[in-house]
Regions:
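A short beta-sheet element
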Residues: 1-6, 120-121, 137-147, 151-201
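Intrinsic low-complexity tandem-repeat regions in disordered proteins
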Residues: 2, 9, 45, 67-70, ...
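Long compositionally biased, domain-poor regions of proteins
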Residues: 6-11, 16, 38, 128, ...
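A short glycine-rich beta-alpha junction/loop motif
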Residues: 20-37, 173-181, 213-232
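Amphipathic alpha-helical segments
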Residues: 30-67, 71, 86, 228-266
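Non-catalytic DNA-recognition/assembly elements of restriction-modification systems
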Residues: 80-101, 261, 272
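Sequence-specific dsDNA recognition surfaces
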Residues: 94-107, 122-151
Length: 287
């Protein structure tokens, strides 16, 4: 019965009507017909469809397992708490910090024909954590204060969707949900940019655990500025980056392949479900 109703879902949804939030009326689906083949046939169909469902669930579990493995090893490599060969500063010692902002939407001169990337959380969701261009752009007239965020700096979500970051590979700006962090000139030669990128995952987690939840959620910026920041030897930073780059490449390869396999299995499942749950009426099969 479950598989039968799942197969009828589209037809059921097509009866939705009403103002506001459309919904399905029982009276509209009372006359929907459900085939009742012999119980042994039902059992065989369920066995086949259960097999397809199980295969899809196994693939999804494997994908989730690979992601957890990557996070585990990344966190292990970035944990310096027991290391005596690492110098420690604070986030405030390491970075210059600036707030993002949104130019007035009512002023067309700030937006029309703009070519300057202006990042929002949507850009990270759509294009990942290394950003070279944005969905929306502003003009130079929309830029104020100290100018653009420089290439090879970072944006960190410090309000709303807290604990997300990205590396900017071009001069740009971001909205007020982000704080821009630029490595201080005195530390440029002591920090590998990709190591800093990976260590932002630790900062992300710190932000999620140090936020003001009253009203509009935002990061406790005083706590963030005081957060300890490790400076391992440059050679060690590059070793960690090499390991994480390889692990990430492998994970991404699997993450790209497994969803495709899941989609293929789902299509296969839907094909056989439709075939197995399509029955001729008795009068159609009568001699």
């Amino acid at each position: 019965l479950y598989y039968c109703l799942t197969n009828m879902q589209e037809a059921i949804y097509s009866t939705k009507k009403g103002g506001g939030v459309p919904h399905v009326h029982i009276s509209d689906i009372d006359n929907f017909e459900i085939p009742v083949p012999p119980v042994d046939v039902q059992s065989k169909i369920v066995e086949i469809l259960d097999c397809f469902s199980s295969l899809e669930a196994e693939l999804e579990a494997e994908l989730e397992k690979r992601k957890r493995q990557y996070v585990y090893y990344r966190d292990m490599l970035l944990n310096f708490s027991d290391r005596k060969d690492v110098d420690w500063l604070t986030v405030n010692d390491v970075f210059e910090m600036r707030n993002g902002y949104t130019p007035s939407k009512s002023n067309r001169q700030f937006w029309e024909g703009g070519t300057i990337p202006w990042f929002r959380m949507d850009d990270i969701r759509a294009n990942g954590r290394i950003l070279s261009d944005s969905i929306l752009h502003i003009t130079d007239k929309g830029v104020k204060g100290k100018g653009l965020f420089e290439a090879n700096t970072f944006i960190l979500a410090t309000s709303a969707t807290i604990g997300e970051h990205a590396l900017l590979t071009t001069d740009s700006l971001a909205n007020q949900r982000f704080t821009n962090l630029k490595i201080k000139e005195t530390l440029i030669q002591k920090l590998d940019l990709k190591f800093v990128f990976y260590y932002f995952f630790v900062i992300d987690d710190f932000c999620k655990h140090h936020s003001n939840k009253s009203g509009f959620e935002s990061v406790d910026m005083d706590a963030l500025r005081k957060m300890p920041y490790p400076i391992p030897a440059l050679e060690e930073q590059r070793r960690i980056v090499g390991v994480l780059d390889k692990f990430e490449s492998l994970t991404e390869s699997l993450a790209a392949g497994l969803p495709a396999e899941i989609i293929a299995r789902r299509k296969q499942y839907e094909y056989y479900r439709d075939k197995l749950l399509t029955f001729k009426r008795k009068e159609e099969t009568a001699p």
